[in-house]
Amino acid sequence: SETEYRQIMDLSPRLKEVIQRHNVFYHIPRAGSGGDSVMIGLHYEDKIYGPLYFDYLQNLAPDDPIMQTRNAFEDMILDGTPESVLILVKASPDTIANRMRDCPHHRQVIQEHDIAHILSRFEDEFVRSKLPNKLVIDTTHHTVEESVAELVKGLGPFFTEEDKQRLDSHKQA
């Protein structure tokens, strides 16, 4: 609700960070959890948008307990789901700006003047990531359908034998 949204947004930066860190920690798959999972944004978005728009994670040293916890997120992902694939979905700054204007979000966070910086930060986080399985999808000149097809094709090399067997069983059904 709008009331709940305002309550969250009115929290101190420290409390917003604590809540978001808990949310990220909660959604990281644990070892042996089995099954498939999709994690969108997770700690990457938070590392980028937190300092830029929500006034947290600014000027924290790597040995700060908050950063030590946050820096362990990828180790947790690797421990719980070592086959995870990190996907960087990107588009040109102009394409993103046009899409934001053509289809505005009710509570748009990203500001048009920040797009180039945000793209650069996501690229930095992608390159720095410990996750070994990586894929880049550039949607600049592609429709949603074309981008999904590129994603499916790009994920192919990362499928485990079990994944391939499950896909085959769905095709036969």
Briefly describe each language-model feature range.
Residues 37-38, 84-88, 134-136:
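Conserved beta-strand scaffold positions in the cores of enzyme catalytic domains, especially
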Residues 101-173:
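NTP-dependent small-molecule kinase module
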Residues 49-125:
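A glycine- and Lys/Arg-enriched "phosphate-lid" helix/loop adjacent to the NTP-binding pocket
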Residues 1:
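Short beta-strand-centered segment that lines the nucleotide-binding/catalytic pocket of NTP-utilizing
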Residues 7, 40, 88-89, 139:
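Small/polar loops that bind or transfer phosphate-bearing groups
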Residues 43-46, 92-94, 141-144:
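Short, solvent-exposed loop/turn segments at secondary-structure junctions
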Residues 5-81:
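Glycine-rich phosphate-binding loop used to anchor ATP phosphates in small-molecule kinases
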